[in-house]
Amino acid sequence: MKTSDITLVFQGAFKSYVTRERDAFVRNIRMTRQVLPGARIVLSTWEGTDVPRNAGFDTVVLSPDPGPLAPLKLDDDKANNANRQLASTRAGLAAVRTPYAVKLRTDCFLEHAGFLDFAAEQRRRDGGRERLLACSFFTLDPLMFERLPYHLSDWFHFGPTELLRAYWSAAPMDARDARHYEQRPHPPGASIFERRFRARFAVEQHLCTQFAGARGYACPRALNDTSEAVLRDHARFMAHEVMLLDPWQIGLVFPKYAWVGASRFQCMNNLMHLDWVALQGPELAGFQDAAGLRRLIRERARSKRLTALAFRHSRLLHGLLFDPQHSSEPVRRMVSRLARHL
C-alpha cells in the first residue's frame, strides 16, 4: 500500500490558534503530514470556522452544526456530541477519493504510522480480508467495570474507505434516546459507572451496534446487556471484524488523554491489543512467538479475572471509591497498590 492510497480525515472543532487547553490543531496536522507525506488530508468541521490557507489541508469540508444533545451522563454537564461527531465524520469520508481512509480527531496526531505494518500483517493472516482497525483505549471490556458491549473506541479508525463509510452510516441519536434514563431506572445490578448514564447507549455503542447488527451479530437491548448471546457475538465481532491496537502501536498521540496509559483502572477496563490477540484462538496461527503470547495472555487473563472478582465483591465501597462527589484519594491509592499485585 502506498501512502498516496490513504486519506486522513480530521474531524471535529478546529481553531487556528493554540487554545487554553493547549490544543494545537495546526501542529497536529503538520506533524501527521510528516508521518504520511503522500497521503491527502481532509478537515471536516463546522460552517463559520476560521481555517487558514496554510494550515496544511488538501480539502476542507464545512457542515452545518447539528447541535448538542443532553449530557451523556447524569452527573455531567458536558454536551453529548454524538450527532456532531457523526455528521462531521460522515461529511469528511464523503470527500475521500482514495481506497483507504483514516478517521481521527482534530485534537490528536500521529507520531508514526506503525498501524500500516500491523494492518498488513493481519491482512496476510486473513488471506486478504479487510478489517476495521481501531484503538484499544476506551474499547471497553464488557466483563470488567463498565459492562458496555460493542463500545468500540472512536478515536482512530483505519480501513477501506467504504468500510469506514459503512461504520459511520449510523442513524443519528434522537433526543429521546439521549434522555433514556431520565425517565426510567437503570437495569437491576447496574454498576456505579453504568448508573451514571443518561443516554440509552454510550455514543460508541450507538455507532457500533448499528454496524454490527446489520451484519447479523446479536446486539444489546440495553446499555449493559451482557446476556450470553450478546457476549458471545461481541467476542466474535471483535475477533473477526476488528483489529485493536494500543495507541503506541498505531502511532496515535492524544495529549488530552495522556493519563489513560498510566491508569491501572483503564488498563483493566479496556480491551487492549493483547486481549484482542487472545480472541484469535489458542493456536494464534500466523503470530510470531505464539508460545510467549500464550503465556502473556494467561497472565493477563488471571489479573483481569481477579480484578473483576474484587470489583464485584467490593460493591459496598464503590460509592466511597468512585463517587466524584466524595474525596477518596487515600482509599484509591491503597486500592491501586493492592491492584498492582493481582
Tell where the protein language model's regions lie, with residue ranges.
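A conserved hydrophobic helix/loop-capping motif in glycosyltransferases and polysaccharide synthases
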Residues: 6-19
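Catalytic core and acceptor-binding pocket of nucleotide-sugar-dependent glycosyltransferases
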Residues: 110-117, 122-282
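Short, well-formed alpha-helical segments that are part of the catalytic scaffolds
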Residues: 17-35
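Short loop->beta transition adjacent to catalytic acidic/histidine clusters or analogous donor-positioning motifs
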Residues: 4-6, 33-43, 58-59
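Membrane-proximal basic amphipathic "stem/tether" segments
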Residues: 263-342
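Active-site acidic Asp-centered loop
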Residues: 104-105
